[in-house]
UniProtKB/Swiss-Prot annotation:
This is F-box/FBD/LRR-repeat protein At2g04230. It comes from Arabidopsis thaliana. PROSITE patterns: FBOX. SUPFAM superfamilies: F-box domain, L domain-like. It comes from the Eukaryota. InterPro entries: F-box-like_dom_sf, F-box_AtFBL13-like, F-box_dom, FBD, FBL13/AtMIF1-like, LRR_dom_sf, LRR_FXL15/At3g58940/PEG3-like. Residues 12-64 form the F-box domain. LRR repeats lie at residues 72-98, 149-176, 177-202, 204-225, 226-251, 271-296, 319-345. Residues 359-410 form the FBD domain. Keywords: Leucine-rich repeat, Repeat. The keyword Cell membrane does not apply.
Length: 448
C-alpha cells in the first residue's frame, strides 16, 4: 500500500513538473468545461485553466444537465463566470454554441466580456430551438480594434441600423444568418476596412432581396446559395470588390442577376451549379481571371464570345455537364493565351448523357491558344469508349502545336473484361499516332 502511494505521488509530480506552456497545450485540446474540472487534481492545476488562450462552450454538452433538460440560464452563468475569471494575457478565441431561445442579454454580456478581453476570434453558433432566434446587440459592434475573425451561424438575426466599426477584422463567415434588411448588410461590410476573406452561405433570399457586397479591401469571396425548394427566386447579388483575387460561387440558381464589377486583380474564379440568371452575364465579369474553374453548362448561362479572356492561363471544365464540349469550344476561342487545360468527370462516368444525344462541333479554325500557347492537357475520367470524347481528344492533340504533356486518366478495367483491355489499348495507340509528328509532347495514360 505504501509502495503504491509513492508511485502515485511520483506520477503526480511528473505531470506537475511539466512547463506551463505544455500543460496549457494539453488543456486546450479539451472542452473548456473539462479543462476547468482539472482544477481539483492538485494545487498545481487549481488556476491553470484560467490561462487558457482558447475557450469553447457548447450548451448541448453541458455536464450539469442532460440533452432533454438544458437550462439556458445556468449555461449562461457558467460562461460568464469562466470569462470573468479568465487571466490569460490574450484571449485568442471564444467559441460559443447555444440555443436560439437564449436570452439576447446573456449573449450581449458574453460578447462584451470577450471584447473587453481583446478576443481575436469569435464564433457564435446558435442552433434553432422552437424556431427561435437570437438578435445580436448592434451597439457592441460600434467599435472594436482587436477582433480578427468573426463566424456567425444559423439562428442569428443581424440588425445594424448604423455602420459598425471592426477595424482589425480580416475574416468574416456568415452561415445562414438572417439580416433585417439590405442596409444591415451594407453597414456590416462597410464597417470592416481590413476585411480580406468573406464567406456567405445562404439557403434563401427571404431576408434580403439584393445582397450587396461592397468592400475595397476584400481579396477572397465565397458565396454558396443552395436555396431550398419553395425559396424566393427573384433576388440578386451585387459584388463590388476591386481588389478581389479569389472568387468561388456555388449554387446561385434562378435569380434576377449576379453583377460583378470588374475585378481587375482576379487570380482565380470557380463557378459551380449556376443557372437561370436572367439579366446578367456572370462570365463577362471574370475576363481578368488567370485561372477559371467552370462547373456549368452553356445551356444554363449566357456565354460571351470574342477573345475576352486574354489573361487566362489555366482552364478547368467538368465533362458531365450538358453540352460541355460547346463551352469548351467557346472558351478555347475566347482564351488566346491559355497554357493549361483540364477536363474532369467528377462522377466517374455514371452521370453522362446518352452518346446519341451528344454532338461536338469543333471550331472552324484552330484557336490561337492551341496553335501557340497550350502546354499541358489533363483529362481526368476520360471515357475512351465514347466517340465524342475521342473526337475532342484527337482535335486538341492534332492542333496543340506547343503541347509538352498530355495526360489521360481512365477508369480501371477489371481483369474479367479482357476484351475491354484490348479495345482500350487500341484507343491509346490511336491517340499516340496523332502525336507522332510532335517529338516534344509526352503522352501519359493512367488508370484510377
Amino acid at each position: 500500500m505504501e509502495q503504491k502511494f509513492k508511485t502515485d505521488s511520483m506520477n503526480e509530480d511528473r505531470i506537475s513538473d511539466l512547463p506551463d506552456a505544455l500543460l496549457l497545450q494539453i488543456l486546450s485540446s479539451l472542452p473548456t468545461e473539462n479543462a476547468i474540472a482539472t482544477s481539483v487534481l492538485s494545487k498545481r492545476w487549481r488556476s491553470l485553466w484560467t490561462m487558457l488562450p482558447k475557450l469553447k462552450f457548447d450548451s448541448n454538452f453541458n455536464p450539469v444537465f442532460d440533452d432533454d433538460n438544458i437550462d439556458p440560464t445556468m449555461f449562461s452563468e457558467n460562461v460568464y463566470k469562466t470569462l470573468s475569471l479568465h487571466k490569460a494575457p490574450v484571449l485568442e478565441s471564444l467559441h460559443l454554441s447555444f440555443e436560439g431561445r437564449t436570452d439576447c442579454l446573456h449573449v450581449g454580456i458574453w460578447i462584451a466580456t470577450a471584447f473587453a478581453r481583446g478576443v481575436r476570434k469569435l464564433v457564435l453558433d446558435s442552433f434553432y430551438q422552437e424556431d427561435q432566434t437570437v438578435t445580436l446587440p448592434s451597439v457592441l459592434f460600434s467599435y472594436n480594434d482587436s477582433l480578427e475573425i468573426l463566424k456567425l451561424k444559423c439562428a442569428i438575426d443581424l440588425d445594424f441600423p448604423s455602420r459598425v466599426c471592426l477595424k482589425s477584422l480580416r475574416k468574416l463567415y456568415l452561415d445562414q444568418v438572417h439580416f433585417k434588411d439590405e442596409e444591415s448588410v451594407c453597414n456590416l461590410l462597410c464597417g470592416c476596412p481590413s476585411l480580406q476573406d468573406l464567406v456567405v452561405h445562404r439557403y434563401s433570399n427571404a431576408d434580403v432581396a439584393t445582397f450587396t457586397i461592397a468592400s475595397p479591401s476584400l481579396q477572397r469571396l465565397t458565396i454558396e446559395d443552395l436555396r431550398q425548394e419553395g425559396g424566393y427566386g427573384n433576388g440578386s447579388y451585387v459584388i463590388n470588390a476591386p481588389g478581389l483575387k479569389y472568387l468561388n460561387i456555388n449554387g446561385v440558381i434562378d435569380i434576377e442577376s449576379c453583377l460583378i464589377d470588374k475585378a481587375l486583380e482576379l487570380e482565380e474564379a470557380k463557378i459551380s451549379n449556376v443557372s437561370g440568371i436572367t439579366n446578367e452575364n456572370i462570365l463577362e465579369s471574370l475576363t481578368s481571371a488567370k485561372r477559371l474553374i467552370l462547373h456549368l453548362s452553356p445551356l444554363e448561362v449566357k456565354v460571351p464570345t470574342g477573345k475576352i479572356f486574354d489573361q487566362l492561363g489555366c482552364l478547368e471544365l467538368l465533362t458531365h455537364e450538358r453540352e460541355w464540349w460547346n463551352l469548351l469550344s467557346i472558351m478555347l476561342d475566347s482564351s488566346p493565351k491559355l497554357q493549361i487545360l483540364k477536363l474532369t468527370d467528377v462522377y466517374l462516368h455514371d452521370n453522362k448523357t446518352n452518346p446519341d444525344e451528344r454532338k461536338w462541333n469543333p471550331p472552324k479554325c484552330a484557336p490561337e491558344c492551341l496553335l501557340f500557347h497550350l502546354e499541358t492537357f489533363l483529362w481526368i475520367g476520360y471515357e475512351w469508349q465514347r466517340g465524342d470524347e475521342k473526337e475532342v481528344a484527337t482535335y486538341i492533340l492534332e492542333n496543340a502545336r506547343r503541347l509538352k504533356k498530355a495526360t489521360f486518366s481512365t477508369k480501371r478495367i477489371g481483369r474479367e473484361k479482357l476484351e475491354d483491355f484490348e479495345k482500350r489499348r487500341e484507343m491509346l495507340n490511336e491517340l499516340a499516332i496523332v502525336l507522332w509528328d510532335s517529338n516534344s509532347c509526352h503522352l501519359v495514360f493512367e488508370s484510377t
